Amino acid sequence: MPFSETDLDRIVTADDLHIAPFRDDGTTYGTPTWIWCVALDGSLYVRGYHGQNSRWYQAAVRQRAGKIVAAGTTTEVTFEPVDGAVNDRIDDAYRTKYAESQYLKPMISDRARSATIRVSPPTTD
């Protein structure tokens, strides 16, 4: 289940997302890490500046769940690694949102692209 359009817009506009995947025990959250985020086709995406060496990325891939804190709200989430052609469109979203930043180039590099994650609220049955 994706974020609502309102929640997604609020998260992306605030640009203050902190990500905290679960630690190896599966119940304790890791230290919240501030990262960039973009929206594409109703989904929220993040990338590891240090690629797959980013600690939060490694935990997100292992645990597949955690929380984000953004726009004054804490949300339980799931994490899904992303690869393939969608990364080109995610690059474009980063270029649009962060065009003036000196950190843009590393965030659209192959290293960062290899650590792209889709962040979603957990599905409810």
Which ranges hold each PLM region?
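Covalent nucleotidyltransferase core used to form phosphodiester bonds in nucleic acids
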Residues: 7-9, 45-58
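Extreme N-terminal tail/first-helix region
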Residues: 1-18
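Catalytic cores of nucleic-acid ligases and guanylyltransferases
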Residues: 125
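Short, structured beta-strand-loop surface elements
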Residues: 51-122
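A generic structural micro-feature
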Residues: 11, 27-29, 60, 109
